[in-house]
Regions:
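Sec-dependent N-terminal signal peptides
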Residues: 26-36
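Single conserved hydrophobic/aromatic residue that forms the stacking wall/gate
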Residues: 1-14
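Conserved functional hotspot residues or short segments at active or partner-binding sites
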Residues: 292, 296-394, 419
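Conserved anion/nucleotide-ligand pocket segment
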Residues: 201-274
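Glycine/threonine-rich flexible loop motifs
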Residues: 153-165
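Glycine-rich, charge-decorated loop segments at or immediately adjacent to ligand/cofactor-binding or catalytic sites
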Residues: 106-111, 180-201
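Glycine-rich oxoanion-binding loops at beta->alpha junctions
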Residues: 115-144
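Active-site loops and adjacent core secondary-structure elements that bind or stabilize anionic groups
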Residues: 10-11, 279-289, 296-301
């Protein structure tokens, strides 16, 4: 019996030893886990837009007379409130709003001239800076201390909101006004396409950028300012950027509000840089349908089996190309496209044109302005492949990528070769 008791005691001691060992291992594991937790949470923390850092914004604007460059995309996502309304509620002295292409509410057709008006809710004047007057005048800036830019870009050089930003920066530099950018993500965050060449400056190519510039509007403003691209003045503007929090290049971003009438969803935004070239041809990109920049077609069955008929659609396009004509082509609404720039669709339609190729570029000068060069059109006519065309872009793109690195406010892609 004594032996049995000793054996039981030894077994109990052994069990305690095992339990203590296991508890030590658990404790070590928990220490390691909790030491990593802050990093894990910071990586998964929610995105905070520049406009949502309201404590920073109000501190910058306190006791100043403010002008806003905003439209329907200037939303604080978490609060679902427009920046104008949020600033007024904070007691900020907003004197006037400057509206880009499509207007303050984003309802104007592409290219439509927007008239000056007043915001129905606040009574604040709204001044159009799209059309004849592309930047604020000295008189319009006279009663302002600072201009705030908060508009969602889509990352393409020919999307005109960044052209508006450039001209407003010029006006601020000319009149010694402070310019503040509230930063937002780039949903087409790639670097690709030909660089805009000298002689091809236009409202769809103000700055010497590739078609996909791979920058946020804040980073782009910094580049424009420091590279001396403000042509109307030797001065730089007094630039400040309210950065986003918890964002890095390459992070996916889905827009909560459509940036313009004919980019109604994320698929259209992804396809836009590649399909915009068709705007210089007679091929319809779906304007006048409920799926613009997601279909392609022309009134000839040789272009494809999918059919659609552009019509006058208020809120999209009231006078679309190929209006009331049955167009044959392709449906890209479900096309698995990750984004970037591709010429495959354009080259496919050009090759299908056959004997009609001589008339394919209905507006060759407009195509060259979109491309930023005449070389792309010449290369297509000569029959070069997409690979060969891309090779011609590489030297200047490499130079641009090196310059781009200097102006990054956020961690870059895993590799610089993302496209």
């Amino acid at each position: 019996h004594l032996c049995d008791r000793r054996q039981r005691q030894m077994c109990i001691r052994d069990r305690y030893t095992v339990i203590i060992y296991v508890m030590k291992q658990i404790f070590i594991f928990l220490v390691i886990l909790f030491s990593l937790t802050p990093t894990v949470y910071s990586q998964n923390a929610p995105l905070k837009l520049g406009a949502e850092r309201m404590d920073v914004v109000t501190r910058l604007l306190k006791d100043k007379r403010v002008g806003l460059v905003v439209n329907q995309t200037s939303i604080l996502e978490k609060r679902q409130i427009h920046l104008l309304d949020a600033l007024v509620a904070e007691g900020i002295d907003v004197k006037k709003v400057f509206a880009p292409e499509h207007g303050f509410r984003g309802t104007g057709d592409a290219g439509e001239e927007i008239k000056d008006s007043r915001d129905l809710k606040t009574g604040i004047p709204i001044i159009s800076i799209y059309g004849k007057n592309k930047k604020p005048s000295t008189e319009q800036l006279g009663d302002l201390d600072v201009i705030v830019f908060d508009i969602q870009d889509v990352g393409a050089r020919f999307y005109t909101y960044i052209s508006t930003m450039h001209y407003v920066m010029e006006a601020c530099a000319e009149n010694n006004k402070e310019f503040i950018v509230l930063d937002r993500p780039n949903p087409n965050d790639f670097v690709d396409g030909p660089i805009r060449q000298k002689g091809f400056e236009s409202f769809v190519g103000v700055d010497p950028l590739p078609i996909l510039h791979g920058l946020t509007v804040g980073e782009l403003a910094w580049m424009i300012n420091k590279e001396g691209w403000l042509k109307s003045t030797p001065d730089t503007c007094r630039l400040k950027i309210v950065k986003m929090e918890n964002w890095k290049h390459g992070d996916p971003y889905w827009l909560p509000v459509k940036p313009s009438p004919n980019l109604p969803n994320d698929q259209s935004i992804r396809l836009y840089p590649s399909l915009c070239f068709f705007e210089a041809t007679n091929v319809s990109v779906g304007r006048g349908t409920y799926y613009p920049f997601q279909v392609l077609g022309f009134p000839d069955p040789k272009y494809g089996n999918f059919t659609f008929t552009p019509t006058s659609l208020p809120g999209f396009d009231t006078n679309p190309l190929q209006k009331d004509k049955v167009c044959y082509g392709i449906d890209l609404r479900e096309y698995p496209f990750e984004g970037g720039l591709t010429l495959r669709f354009f080259l496919d339609f050009y090759n299908k044109a056959g004997k009609d190729q001589a008339f394919f570029f209905s507006r060759p000068n407009w195509f060259d302005l979109l491309a930023g060069t005449k070389q792309l059109r010449y290369q297509i006519v000569r029959g070069l492949s997409e690979k060969e065309i891309r090779e011609s872009w590489k030297p200047e793109l490499d130079q641009y990528k090196a310059m781009r690195k200097k102006y990054l406010l956020y961690p870059d892609y895993p590799t610089q070769n993302k496209k």
